[in-house]
Amino acid sequence: FCLFGTQLSFGQNNREQVLALQRQAIELMDNGDPDQGIVLLRQALTLDPDYWPLTYEMAYAYMVKRDYQKAIKLAKTLYKYEDCNDLVYQLVGNCYDYLKNPKKALKVYAQGLKRFPDSGALYLEQGVVSGMQGHYDEAVASFEKGISVAPMFPSNYYRAAQFYAYSTSKVWSQIYGEIMMNLLPSGDRNKEMSELLFRNYKTGIVFSTDSVSVDFYENRPIAITIDMLLAGDVREPYGAVYEAAMQAAAGGERSVDLESLNR
């Protein structure tokens, strides 16, 4: 019994020391010193070589150092752990992207999504790389799938709002942007999104001498079936409903500014 208690205490002390070294290493990396962070992580790995987050942090440090091949090699060793997470695949895919190999990056994100189908982060990265290649519809589809599976992950709303701002369906830029700002009520991204939404309002609501026009949505034909007619289930597209609401709200105004938007 005494021996078991001693072994248990030693194991607990080891893990506490490992976690302390890990925290110090992360702090060093955050302060721009990945090399010293790697030194501490190596010390920690000698105490607990099977604690995979240490190897992940080391791979991250090499990514910060722009030694992407080393980062990939380390991170791929973590695939074997049943309890590894989606961030491992995100790191590997991002490194391939930094190496100007988007095809491999997308392949890694897809592999990660098979294992972690509810990963908002992997759908985000997949969308960003697709967008950088000019595949805008695929990018938005990835962001929206990420929103569907991980609704509390704000970055997919952020990217979707940015893409829709340059489309004929700005209504979705407004909706996704507002949700993102609720999820991130402060910080640089909140400020950036506030400015984007304001620009959308300025370009989407135009006043003339005696009227106001609203343009947030491109009207498109909708398919109506006999069953829908018989059931009385014919609805206007959301964009059309949004435009009608904006038209009514802007009726008594003469300009778009912070004061009118807050009335």
Regions found by a protein language model. Give the residues of each.
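Canonical tetratricopeptide repeat
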Residues: 57-60, 87-91, 125, 159, ...
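Alpha-helical linker/edge segments of TPR/alpha-solenoid repeat scaffolds
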Residues: 64-69, 98-104, 170-174, 186, ...
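Alpha-helical segment of the N-proximal tetratricopeptide repeat
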Residues: 14-50, 57-60, 64-67
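TPR alpha-solenoid repeat register
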Residues: 54, 88, 122, 156, ...
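Short coil turns that delineate tetratricopeptide repeat
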Residues: 49, 83, 117, 151, ...
